[in-house]
Amino acid sequence: MARASNPRGTTAMWVRDYLDGLWDDRDFRPWYPRDGRPGLSPAQLAMVCVLQFLLNLSDRQAAEAVRCRIDFKYALALELDDPGFHHSVLTDFRDRLCKDDRADQLLSLSLERMRDAGVVTERGRQRTDSTQVLAAARDLSGLELVLEAIRAALEEAAQRAPDILDGLVDAEWATRYGRPVRLPSQPSHPATRLKQAGADARRLLERLPPHRRGPRAETLRQIVVQNFLLDARGGLRPRTAKDGQPKGAVRIVSPYDREARRAIRGNTRWSGYLIHVTETCDTDSPVNLITDIATTRPTRDTEALPGIHDRLSDRRLLPRQHLLDGGYLSVSLLHCSSRDHQVELVGPVKASGAWQSKERSGFTRDDFTIDFDQRQVTCPSGETSHIWLEPPAMAPYTVARFHPHQCDPCPDRPACTRGTAARTVNFLPRHLHELQARNRADQQDSQWRRLYATRSGVEGTICEFVNGHRARRSRYHGLSKTHVQHVLTGIAINIERLAQRTTRHPHRPRSPTTFQQYLDTRGLTWECWWRQGK
């Protein structure tokens, strides 16, 4: 009946037709106790979650689709009169996925089925990029943050032990914290209200002994520590810029999502997370599949790369070449990836931050000749360094210094250094220095540029995540639940791409425009691809 009503099939039907399902109930045995009561099939629930994110459905809509849509029943191998399940079951199943990296295990199992089907292989070419993810919480000012944290702690205390609040909460507290905080852009007396909020938070925490504090109360304690200091009289006062503020990597931005962090990249400011997406990009492959998804706090991209390679190694899907932008690369990662995983990283190493490199004038580090055997450096004017240091504070860099009597009379000093001291040259150990020089030389090669241009295709996948599946904003609170959302979305995109490959006509290149046809008739050449590496 499903085939009769959908002759061309749907994405949901494709999973059963070509893969006979992505998971089996035996794959989920470790997730459940042996003596539990019978429940719903975890393989079917996992498939429903994937279809939910494929079609951007809510939990209620997904449960209704299982009851009403015939292609869902076909994909799940259900009878036509199957009543389905309550929508809250999906919430419970996602909670199971949050534990012990089970979301990554779900992705690994699906990729294993796809590898058995021959649509993804090891030691190919892959590419990675990242984008911002907004937390499921509104941006709060400092005053709103403290007030909302107190409200959240009061709500938790009222649920756990309401007797603790007796004698503390009065009419004024009911006025201040009885409803969600909504302040205008310029609230009246903000400093006074912030000081009052700090005093209220302190009184509340004193009423809550440590052994009776829940997660919301602990969040309030951390917010108080991050935003207040003790004054000379033992009271709390708000922190100022002179006192110093906690770093963004540890500063809590919402009492309802303790793991979200505020970050700045260029002109972009957001509160939330980062998602790193890795996909295949082999030229002979008809479809690119997502092989890894990492959801992290908004830290540097270089910190995410080792974990990506470790997970790909566990899945036996390590690439031969890994295309990355400069944010992921460092010279040490180039060396470690080749040594530990035999993966060639293709991308530009970050340029030097010295003024000579930024202004493209003067003598850069590359203009100096480094003799590692003699442990000395020769400048463009022929002078040799007299000090060779390997300070632990600058590891793994080596420091070579010249003497003032060499630099002061030199006519090229303005092009060499702008400081009052003599020139100092910092460089990496020999094996890393040679690797860095090779990478910068490769960037001038047209063939290398043409290969690296393939990396830009992953930005289309990022766009598919953000615009096609609403991954820009998290549906849930917390890093683990946000990661579950991203993994299920990635599996859904893989299924969608494979279904389009097998149910549609083969891809044909775009026909030339009228003007391009005119150029062809006149025998004039034109660039087929604007990224030619020239």
What residue ranges belong to the model's regions?
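Anion-binding and metal-coordination hotspots
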Residues: 61, 66, 82-83, 91-534
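Residue-level detector of alpha-helical secondary structure
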Residues: 14-18, 47, 65
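Alpha-helical support elements that line or immediately flank enzyme active sites
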Residues: 44-56, 295
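Trp/Phe/Arg-rich N-terminal binding region typifying the photolyase-homology
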Residues: 30-42, 55-102, 106
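A short secondary-structure junction motif
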Residues: 22-26, 69, 73, 468
